[in-house]
From Swiss-Prot:
GO term, biological process aspect, one: L-histidine biosynthetic process
EC number: 3.5.4.19, 3.6.1.31
Protein name, UniProt field: Histidine biosynthesis bifunctional protein HisIE
The keyword Lyase appears for this protein: no
Gene for this chain: hisI
GO MF annotation, one: phosphoribosyl-AMP cyclohydrolase activity
Pfam families on file: PRA-CH (PF01502), PRA-PH (PF01503)
Region (Phosphoribosyl-AMP cyclohydrolase), start-end ranges: 1-111
GO CC annotation: cytoplasm
Chemical reaction(s) catalysed: 1-(5-phospho-beta-D-ribosyl)-ATP + H2O = 1-(5-phospho-beta-D-ribosyl)-5'-AMP + diphosphate + H(+); 1-(5-phospho-beta-D-ribosyl)-5'-AMP + H2O = 1-(5-phospho-beta-D-ribosyl)-5-[(5-phospho-beta-D-ribosylamino)methylideneamino]imidazole-4-carboxamide
Amino acid sequence: MKINWQKVDNLLPVIIQNVATCEVLMLGYMNQEALEKTLAEKRVTFFSRTKNRLWTKGETSGHFLNVVDMSLDCDNDTLLILVNPIGETCHTGAESCFYQFEKTTQPDWIFLSKLERLIASRKGADPESSYTAQLYAKGTKRIAQKVGEEGVETALAATVKDKAETICEAADLVYHLTVLLQDADLSWSDVIHKLKERHTK
């Protein structure tokens, strides 16, 4: 990367974006040392202007930003980093530091990613705490059985052309399939990658 360090006075603005949801999480700054550390460790490290030192996001909270990809803008003076965030990004507990932004315009598919993270967080939880935790506790066979049941019910609803019921059953199917994927340590990203692979053949 050919960064124009002189233009940015040795502090590069860095936009952090969630690779799964495309949500902008925060803005920070990097000097050359912070960028080198980020590239080496694949975790985002900033230069803190208030503390006057390097600061790895998550070093105290455990909410790291794992680097997936990065790209400079056309003027080589702003960096975009795509990340897989571990936990919330904002110190307020919000997923994004831009939490005050009205999110009604976000694409509906972003919700699926958030649902997937919520379902993943239920693994190993007290079975009494939620239906999802109960499913995990009952094991893979029970989860797979529910996927089969919901698949049949979705097909039956579609067969009789009941749109409202088809939507409800499809929602149940997607939910249980998400649980099954997480139980197998897989995600919708794995499924999407396979679809892309088939599409390009």
